[in-house]
């Protein structure tokens, strides 16, 4: 159907039979009927108008109720705003709309109309909305002294999907109906690592959190419980490191021959050239270790992991030489760090690793990048491999022996 661009079909009144003086011929009568159909269609609760014209966001709000997540997010955003800005007595809707960090991931996008609509449904003891001035005003009779330690009011959250962790206020809105007995919110802190922190006004314990009917897959932990689990994790990691160290020192006696292939002729010849610097060293603490097995890889992506580092090393080795296989005995890496310590099977492997990164000049551009190609415009620094020697090397092995 053809509709002239000059006509705004939303503003045209329905035709009644009394307006015949504006319709002069049969063509105009036909246009009148089409306009009437459009006007009738606009009354239906649909996202589109018959004929292909789409309703804009403002018109849609007059037809459909807002998403409950949007209402909860608006309520949570204002609670957190008034806690962050203790000196502010009121805030205009236009100011809230301009704060992009508030609305990350929240749909629909905020407008004055849908915020007014949302605030007409929100009831909160902390603030109220003045429709005439478009101001959200802090209630004068509400005083929130935070006399409970932060340690008892903070919650560690692992959401599903994990990408919600970087959209803290949307996450707070989704949790609102489950945490209502501990509200209001004081703050919400997001991270890109798959977890976030929510700070509440009231004290919360793990037994209460465990009983909440949160969505499947979500993890809610108190600060105390999260700290305990983190300590257990590090203890387990240290145990694995020590076990791996023991395996390295006893590999010649305890490992089956087929676990690690024998050195090729090329490897044996190259090993002879570095054998003088790879002899067993003993210090005053009776520390026994093989020198020149440790290399440090620097400038890794902070969100990478051991599996990705192993794949990256294998790829770099394959580009450096076909005669030496990539055989790291252990990758010592902690989450969020940009460095890793690699323990190799022989000093030859460590030397090959250092030479490979020196000549290939690679950059790890993302957490799962196993090729580390130099992309145009990338601001990431080059990956660097260096040999760990001297007192640092002794301290590393000494720590594993404890």
Curated annotation (Swiss-Prot):
In its keyword annotation, does this UniProt entry include Cytoplasm?
Answer: yes
* Region described as HTH La-type RNA-binding-like region: 64-138
GO term, biological process aspect, one: telomerase RNA stabilization
State the UniProt keywords alphabetically.
Chromosome, Cytoplasm, Nucleus, RNA-binding, Telomere
Task: Give any Pfam family that matches.
Answer: xRRM
Q: What are the annotated GO cellular component locations? A: chromosome, telomeric repeat region; cytosol; nucleus; sno(s)RNA-containing ribonucleoprotein complex; telomerase holoenzyme complex
Specify the xRRM domain's residue ranges. 288-402
Report the InterPro entries cross-referenced here.
Answer: La_xRRM, Lar7_xRRM, Nucleotide-bd_a/b_plait_sf
Q: Where is this region: RRM-like region?
A: 148-230
Null mutant phenotype: Critically short telomeres caused by reduced ter1 RNA stability and telomerase holoenzyme complex assembly defects.
What's a Gene Ontology MF term here?
Answer: telomerase RNA binding
* Location of region: xRRM-like region: 288-400
Location in or out of the cell: Chromosome, Telomere; Nucleus; Cytoplasm
Q: Is Nucleus there in the keyword field?
A: yes
- Which family is it part of? Belongs to the LARP7 family.
Its assembly, as annotated, is: Component of the telomerase holoenzyme complex composed minimally of trt1 and the telomerase RNA template component. Interacts with skp1.
Its function, per the record, reads:
RNA-binding protein required for assembly of the holoenzyme telomerase ribonucleoprotein (RNP) complex. Specifically binds telomerase RNA ter1 and promotes assembly of ter1 with catalytic subunit trt1. Telomerase is a ribonucleoprotein enzyme essential that copies new telomeric repeats onto chromosome ends and functions to maintain cell division.
Protein name per the record = La-related protein 7 homolog
According to its UniProt entry, this protein's organism is Schizosaccharomyces pombe (strain 972 / ATCC 24843)
Gene name of the encoded protein: pof8
């Amino acid at each position: 159907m053809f509709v002239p661009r000059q006509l705004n079909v939303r503003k045209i009144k329905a035709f009644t039979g009394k307006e015949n003086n504006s319709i002069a011929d049969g063509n105009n009568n036909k246009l009148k009927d089409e306009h009437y159909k459009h006007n009738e269609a606009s009354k239906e609760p649909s996202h589109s108008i018959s004929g292909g014209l789409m309703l804009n966001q403002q018109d849609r709000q007059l037809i459909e109720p807002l998403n409950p997540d949007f209402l909860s997010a608006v309520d949570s955003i204002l609670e957190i705003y008034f806690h962050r800005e203790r000196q502010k007595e009121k805030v205009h809707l236009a100011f809230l709309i301009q704060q992009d960090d508030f609305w990350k991931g929240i749909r629909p996008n905020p407008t004055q109309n849908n915020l007014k609509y949302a605030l007409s449904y929100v009831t909160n003891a902390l603030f109220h909305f003045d429709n005439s001035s478009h101001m959200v005003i802090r209630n004068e009779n509400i005083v929130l002294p935070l006399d409970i330690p932060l340690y008892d009011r903070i919650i560690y959250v692992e959401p599903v999907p994990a990408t919600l962790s970087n959209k803290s206020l949307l996450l707070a809105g989704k949790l609102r109906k489950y945490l209502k007995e501990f509200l209001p919110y004081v703050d919400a802190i997001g991270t890109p690592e798959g977890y976030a922190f929510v700070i509440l006004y009231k004290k919360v314990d793990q037994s209460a959190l465990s009983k909440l009917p949160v969505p499947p897959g979500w993890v809610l932990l108190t600060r105390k419980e999260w700290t305990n689990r983190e300590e257990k994790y590090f203890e387990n990691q240290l145990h694995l490191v020590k076990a791996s160290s023991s395996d390295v020192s006893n590999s010649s006696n305890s490992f089956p021959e087929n676990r690690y292939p024998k050195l090729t002729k090329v490897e044996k010849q190259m090993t002879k050239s570095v054998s003088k610097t790879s002899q067993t060293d003993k210090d005053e603490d009776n520390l026994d270790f093989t020198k020149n097995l440790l290399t440090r890889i620097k400038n890794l992506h902070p969100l990478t992991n051991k599996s990705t580092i192993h794949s990256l090393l294998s790829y770099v080795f394959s580009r450096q030489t076909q005669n030496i296989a990539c055989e790291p005995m252990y990758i010592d890496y902690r989450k969020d760090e940009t460095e890793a310590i690699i323990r190799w099977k022989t000093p030859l492997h460590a030397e090959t690793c250092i030479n490979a990164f020196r000549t290939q000049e690679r950059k790890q551009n993302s957490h799962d990048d196993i090729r580390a190609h130099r992309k145009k415009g990338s601001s990431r620094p080059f990956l660097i491999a260096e040999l760990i020697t001297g007192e640092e090397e002794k301290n590393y092995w000494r720590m594993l022996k404890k």
